[in-house]
């Protein structure tokens, strides 16, 4: 599970990122850059992190018409990021266009970034999905439907809750990538996410990657928290 622990850099700007990364001198991380940080700092934050030797999941959740998504992905691939995502609700044509854009934009001699789709946000409960989004399926059925569509569209995997991983293994196979946010240490608050799990539980359920934010970034000692999460996730002492 080398570098399958992704640290969410949910910070408002580069200064906060620099301060956080001082705890990890010499450590090559797999980090997630989301909307807040990317919209504030732009592509320069990607360049900065790459120069530090980190892998990057650029979490922008694209959802637009196919041609727009294709063009956007072409641009994102040129930044040499390692993972990107879209909303599965955008449909098959949009997801196929995303892959086309990534192939066209990837740097020479390198593989295209891993491309995954969001099924349902981990802040979404089944009651909310039915009442507000208008999907009458169970949450598990809706996620499985989107995951199957994602695989058929040529993407590498999905973002999903750990609770949905076993079902997705049945539907999409063991090679299908599952990236699971909503990971907390047992002692942490769950905050605004509904479907959460510990690193150990994510490992037991078969997640490919876990995304951990506050448990590490808000810790008194981020490096020690990182090591604790990594130990629980990988099942070994680090």
Swiss-Prot record:
**GO BP term, example:** 'de novo' pyrimidine nucleobase biosynthetic process
Q: Which residues bind substrate?
A: 10, 32, 59-68, 122, 184, 193, 213-214
Please name the GO terms that the record assigns under molecular function.
orotidine-5'-phosphate decarboxylase activity
What does it catalyze? orotidine 5'-phosphate + H(+) = UMP + CO2
Question: Record's Gene3D superfamilies?
Answer: Aldolase class I
Concerning PANTHER family, the annotation shows: OROTIDINE 5'-PHOSPHATE DECARBOXYLASE
User: One GO term of the cellular component aspect?
Assistant: cytosol
Tell me what this protein is called.
Orotidine 5'-phosphate decarboxylase
Pathway it works in: Pyrimidine metabolism; UMP biosynthesis via de novo pathway; UMP from orotate: step 2/2
- Specify one Pfam family: OMPdecase
Q: Which HAMAP family match?
A: OMPdecase_type1_B
Q: Which gene encodes it?
A: pyrF
Q: What does this protein do?
A: Catalyzes the decarboxylation of orotidine 5'-monophosphate (OMP) to uridine 5'-monophosphate (UMP).
Matching entries from InterPro entries are given as: Aldolase_TIM (IPR013785), OMPdecase (IPR014732), OMPdecase_AS (IPR018089), OMPdecase_bac (IPR047596), OMPdeCOase_dom (IPR001754), RibuloseP-bd_barrel (IPR011060)
Enzyme class, top EC level, equals lyase
Q: What is its EC number?
A: 4.1.1.23
- Keywords from the UniProt entry: Decarboxylase, Lyase, Pyrimidine biosynthesis
Assigned protein family: Belongs to the OMP decarboxylase family. Type 1 subfamily.
Which residue positions are annotated as catalytic?
61 (proton donor)
**Assembly behavior:** Homodimer.
Look up the domain of life of the source: Bacteria
């Amino acid at each position: 599970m080398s570098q399958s622990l992704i640290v969410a850099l949910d910070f408002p700007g580069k200064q906060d990122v620099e301060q956080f990364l001082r705890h990890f001198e010499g450590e090559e991380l797999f980090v997630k850059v989301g909307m807040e940080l990317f919209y504030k700092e732009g592509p320069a934050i990607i360049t900065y992190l790459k120069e530090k030797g980190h892998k990057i999941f650029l979490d922008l959740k694209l959802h637009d018409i196919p041609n727009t998504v294709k063009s956007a992905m072409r641009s994102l691939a040129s930044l040499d990021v390692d993972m990107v995502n879209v909303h599965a609700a955008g449909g098959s044509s949009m997801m196929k266009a995303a892959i086309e854009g990534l192939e066209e934009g990837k740097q020479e001699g390198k593989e295209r970034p891993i491309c995954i789709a969001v099924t349902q946000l981990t802040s979404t409960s089944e009651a909310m999905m039915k009442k507000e989004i208008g999907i009458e399926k169970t949450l598990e059925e809706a996620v499985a439907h989107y995951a199957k569509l994602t695989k058929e569209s040529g993407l590498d995997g999905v973002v999903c809750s750990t609770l949905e991983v076993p079902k997705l293994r049945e539907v999409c196979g063991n090679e299908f990538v599952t990236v699971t946010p909503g990971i907390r240490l047992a002692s942490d608050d769950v905050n605004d996410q509904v479907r959460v799990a510990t690193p150990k539980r994510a490992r037991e359920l078969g997640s490919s990657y876990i995304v951990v934010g506050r448990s590490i970034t808000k810790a008194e000692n981020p490096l020690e928290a990182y090591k604790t999460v990594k130990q629980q996730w990988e099942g070994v002492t680090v």
